[in-house]
Amino acid sequence: MKLTALSVDGFKNLKGVSLIPDPSYNLILGENAQGKTNLLEAIWTLTGCRSFRGTRERDYLPFSGGNLQVEAKFQDARREQSVRLCMVSGTVPEKKIWCNDIPQKSSALFSVFHCVTFTPEDLSLVEGGPERRRTFLDLCSAQLHAPMLGLVRRYQLALQQRNAVLKQRLPEAQAAGLLEIWDRQLEQLGTEIAVQRGIYVRRLAEVCVPLYAQIARGRETVSLHYQSSVFGEDAQDTLPEMRTPELVQQYGEKMRQSRSSDLLLGHTASGAHRDDLLLAIDGKPAKEFGSQGQKKSLALALKLAQAEIYSKRRKESPVVLLDDVMGELDEARQAVVSTIVQEMQVFVTTCHPESLLSPKNGKRFLLKDGMLTGDVENRPETA
């Protein structure tokens, strides 16, 4: 998958940005706060997903007021496609999307255009809480299994309804009928989510473990385990091998066993919303015992594995967005990144191009005050 044309106007501080990207390597230069990350974020919006920076959609609108528009053409494995996103400012901003000139919802974009990002915030994959890793697993799974995001949304809605019943603190006999309605939905949805996570963690471990060994130059080993609050630790080994009806029954039994304690707590204490991806370095939890360098290497290995898995399973590469991270890596780690993404289209932002191992070919774009300045130049290493 390659972006062949991009036009951005009114996205935060970006004004009239129009470029023809290189099919391989694109270096986005500029001082801090000039719009480099905003440009990557504008590309990311074309996936239909929430911002990788956690930005609210209304905050995409230009700082000075007005409307925004992001337009792109891209080539996938079959054909060239186009996508256009417009947002009109107002008390409630109005967003419109067209894919190949046909009006669409944001959710439709996810199955059309795919990116993999690596940003400084991705260190939270290792240092953050379980929710961050669950979100990562669900997004990665959805890139290969399109219904996944819908499953997660429906699960969350059913969970909210079950928790609303629990918060009423009704006697168990009175609450049982209401809870049974939501338990039935949660056991079906939760099982499907857990199975997809288990399948993905198995694939992730197969790719991430050797990648980390490359990045760490064999100094230590990493291990990944899918911990399910219903199906136990190492669920990536057991879930894909079991029949779905048996798993649904097991999930339902867990829900009914915890009903009394859930009523006392006022919330649902077990289920897919309590799962985690356990990350260990030399057998010890990476979050507690890993050094900053080890955590950064592990986060990098996870994101590179995501890109490699997507490429192998989908038979085409995602667009890769590297936001202000390459300059922080030593030459050995940069070389690993370059090897993994060499067949992919990459956008790299930096303030310090001299710190990068840049390929001989590619394009360089200079951003200042939200606008492209000067001519686009080849050979990014000459900056």
Q: What is each model feature region?
A:
Residues 45-57, 305-313:
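Post-Walker A helix-loop "phosphate-sensing" segment adjacent to the P-loop in P-loop NTPases
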Residues 72, 345-352:
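Structural recognition of the conserved hydrophobic beta-strand(s) that form the central parallel beta-sheet
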Residues 1-31, 173-319, 328-339, 345, ...:
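Conserved NTPase motor "head" modules and their coupling/switch loops across ABC/AAA+ ATPases, GTPases
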Residues 124-125, 131-180, 184-187:
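Long, charged N-terminal accessory/stalk domains
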Residues 36:
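Conserved lysine of the Walker
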Residues 323-325:
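Walker B catalytic acidic pair
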Residues 48-132, 138-148, 207-210, 247, ...:
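Nucleotide-state sensing region of NTPase/ATPase domains
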